[in-house]
Regions:
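Long, well-ordered core segments of solenoidal/helical folds
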Residues: 539-552, 604-619, 682-703, 731-746
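Well-ordered alpha-helical scaffold segments within catalytic/enzyme domains
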Residues: 264-268, 477-482, 584-598, 613, ...
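Solvent-exposed loop and edge beta-strand segments that line ligand/cofactor-binding
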Residues: 459-461, 465, 569-581, 651-665, ...
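Solvent-exposed beta-strand/loop surfaces of large extracellular or lumenal domains
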Residues: 70-97, 453-455
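Beta-strand/loop-rich accessory regions of lumenal/periplasmic or secreted enzymes
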Residues: 138-512, 557-560, 576-579, 663
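Solvent-exposed beta-hairpin/edge-strand motifs
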Residues: 55-75, 317-329
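Bacterial N-terminal signal peptides
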Residues: 11-23
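An acidic-aromatic substrate-binding cleft motif
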Residues: 120-159, 163-166, 171, 332-338, ...
Length: 746
């Protein structure tokens, strides 16, 4: 037996122990790495909600719990961090987060993350969401001072639930802070009429009935900020009027008594009276048996004759205030193109009067030819804001900010539109006899919205009208507040309420440092704006400023136009809407992150908002089985429903009108996905997924897998796959990439 001496193995043990210590020290050092991201809030107003998307370099963050926000003094402030996407399949680390916080007095903040960092969960105020998924259930949101409920369905059921109003069925405001009681109810919703899209045709007016079918807590819902998606349909009495889908996203905030409502409707009417042929247009045919003959269409006057028009569109609340109500609003003193100062207005409604604020402008339906400014002078006398008691003389100006308050001596409701002027016509109306407050995205007090063509000529290669299936999203603010000094905590409660909604109408813009966006490589290799290439940067700035200048000079405003740009300048006139060709909105997002310029952010947001809705086809969709009922029969009933349009998710071609020409390749989702990442806009990803589904269906056969259809689809699918990790989209993308590679050798 060998005699092993201790000294013969001692050096090995010491060596292994040393390696172990060094390894753990290296691990400790690696874990202690932290990252600091400078964030600036432009045009800051303290205590304003801030939501921004921040990209994270690959391999540096695996949990959103390891992220916090510091103020300008290095102190952690309450924040809500949401994991949005990862670097998969390359790496399981986080690629995008949403950072939410309320701004403070200073403009500068730091987002900090690392393995030794934890979010302190410093929540002195939180909100809660209870979402009952039953067919006659409801969603209840409680922010602390505000509680509201949205009912689902047409009523009845096991609990004999009331029919939904289509919007907020009950709103309570707890000014005393002692819990919600019966006398805290400040507004309710009229059954099926708190959300409306009324259609007018030759048979007369057909008022809608709104039915909520589904409520969802969106990604990004947490203790400080909730996003509630409300899906439903408008139903009509006459069978010739198709049901129309709507989606609302309601944003609520901890400790706040205001909400932001993003209201999206889809137009499902028959836009004009031309004689329809059976079949499809040659440019977008999915078969070869039935092809439309466009020759007789050129002689059909029905294209210029409106059929189903929008008579009224908007939201309504029935307020529960005292009889001694007063209404407040304001308008700008200057010309429409130079709004600087405002004049305030208030009057008592005496329990029976109605009051409205209406913003109008030229060519409401925006059917060409469009009236615009000349080369050297602005348009004059074409925009009008009017306000006053209904039935009496009204005051007028050219432009109004777009808010109204109805209040008694204790409580009030203030409602406002984003882009009240730019997306005219809009109206805010209070009827103190009926106790209703109406926010009209399209008011019945102007001519109905028409979707007819300007003529029956060819427009971008087609004689067609594809208005059926377009959508539009409108943003509104609803603020429920106290009106006396004690309940509001303000020395001037009405002024502060107005200032609050005006801040929310044009909120501050949060932006991480351009260097961080570049370092993350979330957008690939990207150079930030720099003096190193001053001449190049100057040319870029001139291009973007020139586009903004023309948008505001002409102006390219109106509900169906705002966010888009005309393309060609010929014989002193701008012509042909761009319709996002090619990815115009995306370049604004890129320039925003390169520079931090808040003006670029606002144009990017408006451009994406327009193109994803107006410049796309959204209806009729294939039936979707959600599975929110207990009966298995429902799945088979859904499957037996007719299939939708093959063109869902396909964009529109540049044309003189937004809805007169389609082409299979013409859709660009990069800006929409960027709005989802950078701005938390769920609508952007929602519409991008419509395009992904369109690719998966391959409705154009081999045609859709060649030429620019192929390379544009690869770009679009790459953006959507990165955001969703959907295996069906991934398989479609990889097959198309393989085809594109093979074409290099064939």
């Amino acid at each position: 037996m060998k005699n092993y001496q201790p000294f013969t193995i001692k050096p090995i043990i010491i060596f292994l122990i040393g390696i172990f210590i060094l390894h753990n020290q290296a691990g400790i050092q690696a874990q202690s790495i932290s990252y600091s991201i400078p964030v600036e809030v432009k045009d800051n107003v303290p205590d304003t909600p801030q939501l921004l998307g921040i990209p994270i370099p690959k391999g540096t963050l695996y949990s959103s719990d390891y992220v916090r926000v510091l103020n300008a003094y290095g102190q952690e402030i309450p924040s809500q961090i949401t994991k949005v996407s990862t670097w998969e399949p390359a790496d399981a680390s986080i690629k995008w987060i949403w950072v939410f916080f309320f701004s403070e007095e200073e403009d500068s903040y730091t987002v900090e993350y690392g393995d030794d960092i934890r979010n302190g969960r410093l929540y002195d105020k939180v909100l809660t969401v209870n979402n009952n998924q039953r067919p006659t259930g409801e969603v209840e949101v409680n922010t602390g001072p505000l509680r509201f409920t949205i009912e689902k369905g047409i009523g009845g059921g096991y609990l004999n639930a009331p029919p939904s109003s289509g919007f907020m069925d009950k709103v309570e405001l707890d000014l005393e802070g002692d819990g919600f009681e019966e006398d805290d109810v400040i507004a309710t919703g009229a059954a099926q009429r708190a959300n409306f899209l009324d259609i007018l045709d030759d048979a007369g007016l057909d008022p809608s009935k709104a039915v909520v079918t589904r409520t969802v807590k969106e990604l990004g819902t947490g203790p400080l900020h909730a996003i509630i998606r409300v899906e439903g349909e408008y139903h009509y009495e006459r069978e010739d009027n198709n049901s129309a889908p709507f989606v609302m996203r309601i944003h609520a905030y901890a400790g706040k008594s205001y909400v932001r409502v993003q209201h999206t409707f889809v137009y499902t009417g028959v836009p004009d009276k031309h004689t329809k042929q059976l079949g499809e247009y040659e440019a977008i045919a999915t078969q070869m048996e039935n092809i439309i003959d466009e020759e007789p269409l050129s002689q059909d006057p029905g294209f210029t004759q409106a059929n189903d028009r929008i008579a009224a569109l908007g939201l309504r609340l029935d307020y529960k205030l005292k009889d001694n109500t007063t209404v407040y609003t304001e308008a700008f003193n200057e010309a429409w193109y130079n709004p600087m100062t405002t004049q305030a207005f208030s009057t008592s409604l005496e329990g029976q009067k109605a009051f409205s604020l209406l913003q109008s402008g030229p060519n409401l339906s925006q059917i060409p030819p469009l009236e615009n400014s000349g080369s050297n002078a602005r348009m004059e006398g074409v925009f009008e804001a009017s306000w006053g008691i209904e039935g009496g003389s009204k005051s007028t100006a050219e432009r109004a900010p777009g808010w109204i308050t109805i209040a008694d001596d204790e409580r009030g409701i203030t409602v406002a539109f984003d882009q009240f002027f730019e997306e005219y016509p809009k109206e805010l109306m209070v009827d103190d006899d009926a106790k209703t407050l109406q926010a009209y995205a399209w008011t019945p007090n102007v001519e109905p919205l028409s979707f007819a063509k300007q003529n029956n000529n060819t427009d971008s290669g087609m004689i067609a009208n594809f208005a059926q299936g377009l959508a539009k999203t409108t943003d509104m603010i609803f603020f429920f507040h106290g009106t006396d000094k004690a309940s509001s905590g303000s020395a001037q409660p009405q002024v502060d309420a107005a200032n609050q909604v005006k801040t929310l109408m044009r909120p501050p813009v949060a932006h991480a440092s351009p260097e961080w966006y570049s370092k993350s490589e979330a957008f690939g290799k990207m150079a930030v704006a720099s003096d190193a290439f001053a001449d190049y940067e100057r040319h870029l700035d001139h291009k973007f400023d020139w586009m903004r200048y023309n948008q505001q000079w002409e102006p390219w405003y109106g509900m169906l136009n705002y966010g888009d740009f005309l393309t060609y300048y010929y014989r002193n006139e701008w012509q042909m809407w761009t319709n996002n060709e090619p990815a115009n909105d995306y370049m604004w997002w890129l320039q925003f992150i390169r520079t931090g310029n808040p003006d670029y952010y606002r144009v990017a947001k408006a451009s994406s908002k327009h193109t994803m809705d107006i410049d796309n086809v959204h209806w009729p969709k294939d039936p979707e089985y959600v599975g929110d009922t207990n009966e298995s029969l429902h799945a088979f009933q859904w499957a037996a429903q007719p299939k939708g349009s093959p063109y869902i998710g396909m964009g529109r071609r540049h044309a003189d009108q937004h809805y007169t020409s389609l082409l299979s390749a013409h859709v660009w989702v990069a800006g929409w996905v960027s709005s989802y990442y950078l701005d938390g806009n769920h609508r952007g990803l929602e519409v991008a997924k419509e395009t992904a589904n369109y690719y998966v269906k391959r409705v154009f056969g081999e045609h859709g897998l060649t030429g620019r259809r192929l390379y544009l689809s690869v770009w679009n699918l790459a953006e959507i796959v990165d955001a969703t990790k959907n295996p069906d989209y991934t398989a479609e993308l990889m097959d198309r990439v393989e085809r594109m590679v093979q074409f290099q050798y064939d």
